Amino acid sequence: MTIMRKTHPLFKIINNSFIDLPTPSNISSWWNFGSLLGVCLIMQILTGLFLAMHYTSDTTTAFSSVAHICRDVNYGWLIRYMHANGASMFFICMFIHVGRGIYYGSYVLSETWNIGIILFLTTMATAFVGYVLPWGQMSFWGATVITNLLSAIPYIGTSLVEWIWGGFSVDKATLTRFFAFHFILPFIVTALVLVHLLFLHETGSNNPSGLDSNSDKIPFHPYYTIKDLLGVLLLLMVLMILVLFFPDILGDPDNYTPANPLNTPAHIKPEWYFLFAYAILRSIPNKLGGVLALILSILVLALFPLINSSKQHGLVYRPITQFIYWIFIANLLVLTWIGGQPVEYPFTVIGQISSIMYFSIIIIFMPIANMIENDILKLHY
């Protein structure tokens, strides 16, 4: 008799995705981050569900309800900080996951890559609307500033902003709908994750060598289930150190002040994981130009499958592109730092240079390096 997991219609799907899945035998720990993102997503949905049981999406009580969760609900402080810092862990894993995709040339699996970009954007939208919910000063002003950017769209901009706000300013209607969006978006993310996996399992995983691995595959379970479990334990350890010892280190002190439309904080800035995009937005003096640059800072990732002309897969044996890649990562860190600084000299200039570098590396320098490396290969072979 055949094993049930191989014949049962439902178990068969799980079996082919997580148990008997043929996996390259040489994938390194950089491939752990996909499963870590899955763990983060499940954790965010569960903690979010329990928070939603006690949260009220009304401007008069939202701030108090979050304080009530932290003070009066059993382990409410733990759930709240796991949710807030879990979002940071989610984005750390996502940045590493995308960075690994660029380094090892995973973008050649273009369907998986493009669904990944949509996932990235959807997760950013989820985090943005979630940041508004505690209704602190930074929540309110962050929502005002970012939604106001849509007014740069010609002709329909102002109407669009008022439509999103549900009035003439960020108010009760805005908070209620943002809560609704924040509740539904993670489930849309989950659906997209399944599509992401569907496309990935059509082609199979990439591997560090960049070579075809069909001749050397091993079952996912037990080898990679154990390997992923180690990653999960490390992730939870880092998360719990954050939650239990430094719960507010990644947050903004201004968000402990209730939202006040009459008092603007000195420096309006989003959560740390948006700072690189925020720096790119601010580096362009024109409003519409800034908005376009902000959107393009993520959509530019979709160019990787199109502009890749290298004869080799990944950057393992490509020292010139490797060098450019690490400059790109350093530049991204500079942008993140600039995004959190006030708009004054020299930060504005550094931000503008870094923004130009960000796009130039992807669109100009990497393709040139590809061509040089292809020519070097021709000389040898």
Curated annotation (Swiss-Prot):
GO terms for biological process: mitochondrial electron transport, ubiquinol to cytochrome c. Keywords: Electron transport, Heme, Iron, Membrane, Metal-binding, Mitochondrion, Mitochondrion inner membrane, Respiratory chain, Transmembrane, Transmembrane helix, Transport, Ubiquinone. Its cofactor is heme b. GO terms for cellular component: mitochondrial inner membrane; respiratory chain complex III. It comes from the Eukaryota. Gene3D superfamilies: Cytochrome Bc1 Complex, Chain C. A ubiquinone binds at residue 201. It is found in: Mitochondrion inner membrane. InterPro entries: Cyt_b/b6_C, Cyt_b/b6_C_sf, Cyt_b/b6_N, Cytb/b6-like_sf, Cytochrome_b, Cytochrome_b_C_euk/bac, Cytochrome_b_N_euk/bac, Di-haem_cyt_TM. It holds the Pfam family Cytochrome_B. The keyword S-adenosyl-L-methionine does not apply. The chain crosses the membrane at residues 33-53, 77-98, 113-133, 178-198, 226-246, 288-308, 320-340, 347-367. Binds 2 heme b groups non-covalently. GO terms for molecular function: metal ion binding; ubiquinol-cytochrome-c reductase activity. Its main location: mitochondrion. Heme b b566 binds at residues 97, 196. It is a multi-pass membrane protein. Heme b b562 binds at residues 83, 182. Component of the ubiquinol-cytochrome c reductase complex (complex III or cytochrome b-c1 complex) that is part of the mitochondrial respiratory chain. The b-c1 complex mediates electron transfer from ubiquinol to cytochrome c. Contributes to the generation of a proton gradient across the mitochondrial membrane that is then used for ATP synthesis. Heme 1 (or BL or b562) is low-potential and absorbs at about 562 nm, and heme 2 (or BH or b566) is high-potential and absorbs at about 566 nm. Belongs to the cytochrome b family. The cytochrome bc1 complex contains 11 subunits: 3 respiratory subunits (MT-CYB, CYC1 and UQCRFS1), 2 core proteins (UQCRC1 and UQCRC2) and 6 low-molecular weight proteins (UQCRH/QCR6, UQCRB/QCR7, UQCRQ/QCR8, UQCR10/QCR9, UQCR11/QCR10 and a cleavage product of UQCRFS1). This cytochrome bc1 complex then forms a dimer. This is Cytochrome b. The gene is MT-CYB.
